[in-house]
Amino acid sequence: MAHKPDFLLDRLLYRDGLMLVIDKPAGLAVHAGPSSKQGSDNLENYFDALRFGFPKPPALAHRLDRDTSGCLVLGRHPKALRKLHRLFADGKVEKTYWAITKGVPEKLSGTINAPLAKQTRGSGWRVEIADDGQQAVTTYRVLARGDGLAFIEARPKTGRTHQIRVHLASLGAPILGDPQYGDLSDADRAHPMMLHARRILIPLSKTKGPIAVAAPPQDEMIALLTKLGVEID
């Protein structure tokens, strides 16, 4: 393991009897994939430290890309996990992402309605806009801009793989540091991917308001936002 076994305890944002929300670090896959190297590290390796007295560790209620940071929801037991899976599948969970892009969209706010499909390219795959793809909708607004960069708030209304990354790239504003859909100059390679799951609203109860959780942006994003004149609460 590349981290201490209990390092996620310091990244715990929310805890109750049904779920946990953690601040996922960038650069660590949430689970081992089919193309993962044997023995490669992933976030699930550290869930045992998050039992908090439960007989089994929590499990993923949804996923974030390896290079995305921020709010990640875990179910603490099978019944809770089923409920969370339904909420995500039905689009009931409201997700807000922050992105810093290389390039500024022509329209400073809007809705991107562009279907997406996974395409095999050579030895790998990527997601592309395709007429016969799955429906994918993202709303966005530019919060700040300067030096050829834009600070964008994006809200996916659907949950397709790489959705925000592909949608913003389609506007001529790929996410800074995106290793797959970005314009990776030598300078860009110095940055981790600037996509952060900033806030999540989860309507767990029918009688109470949704649970709101926010994750602080990583230091590299804060540094760029400061250059753009953005103050973080």
What is each of the regions a protein language model found here?
Residues 1-126, 130-137, 144-145, 216-232:
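RNA pseudouridine synthases
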Residues 147-155:
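Short histidine-centered loop motifs in beta-beta connectors
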Residues 78, 157-158:
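Loop/turn elements at beta-strand to alpha-helix junctions within RNA-recognition modules
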Residues 1-18, 28, 157, 165-233:
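Pseudouridine synthases involved in rRNA/tRNA modification
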